[in-house]
Regions:
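A short acidic, glycine-rich active-site loop
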Residues: 62-78
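Glycine-rich, Arg-bearing micro-motifs that act as flexible, cationic patches
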Residues: 117-141, 156-159
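Small/aliphatic-rich secondary-structure junction motif
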Residues: 3-63
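Structural beta-alpha unit
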Residues: 1-9, 23, 84-118, 154-161
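Short secondary-structure boundary segments
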Residues: 46, 121-123, 151-152
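Short, hinge-like loop/turn segments at secondary-structure boundaries
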Residues: 59-63, 112-114, 136-138
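General small-molecule cofactor/ligand-binding pocket signal
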Residues: 43-45, 94-98, 148
Length: 161
């Protein structure tokens, strides 16, 4: 994919992955700016951990109780509600909650609808993220549409496309 900038594209439908992080809010702010400029609609996507699939993972090995799906879903719904409040009323916005691993769910959601771009924040996992693979890296390498990743670096905000 070419090195496109968000400002260079005419956008109608944006998929914005939100997780409550500062970098996620930066991605949402960039989406709002683009939506106002292009009269575009925004879909906010939050991916909740699927408790049934994660129950056999690290938490079980560590002896922790399995995660409560209702709590996980409620946290994702709250993240979506907080994100909706950041979108001006003149922008059409809808919420989408999915369960699973964030990277594959974001890519799947994008493939299931006619979005022009995906915007998401980088969590800044550093070397560990590089070893295990970050959500933003997964989305950038697997999505069929442009992906824009916002970064929050030590209190300094920047956005990369």
């Amino acid at each position: 994919m070419s090195e496109e900038r968000l400002e260079e594209l005419h956008l109608r439908r944006l998929l914005v992955a939100v997780d409550g992080s500062e970098s996620g809010r930066l991605a949402l702010r960039a989406a709002v700016t683009a939506a106002l400029r292009d009269n575009a609609a925004i879909t906010l996507l939050c991916v909740a951990v699927d408790a049934a699939k994660s129950a056999g993972g690290f938490a079980a090995v560590a002896g922790a109780p399995p995660p409560d799906q209702a709590r996980l879903d409620a946290a994702a719904e709250e993240t979506l509600a907080e994100s909706v409040r950041l979108v001006p009323t003149e922008i059409p916005v809808r919420k989408l909650l999915r369960r699973g691993h964030a990277g594959p769910e974001i890519v799947a959601a994008a493939a299931e609808s006619d979005y022009d771009a995906i915007l998401l924040g980088a969590r800044g996992l550093g070397r560990i993220g590089a070893l295990i693979g970050s959500v933003s890296s997964y989305v950038m390498h697997n999505a069929e549409i442009p992906v824009f990743v916002a970064h929050a670096v030590r209190g300094v905000e920047k956005s990369a496309g």
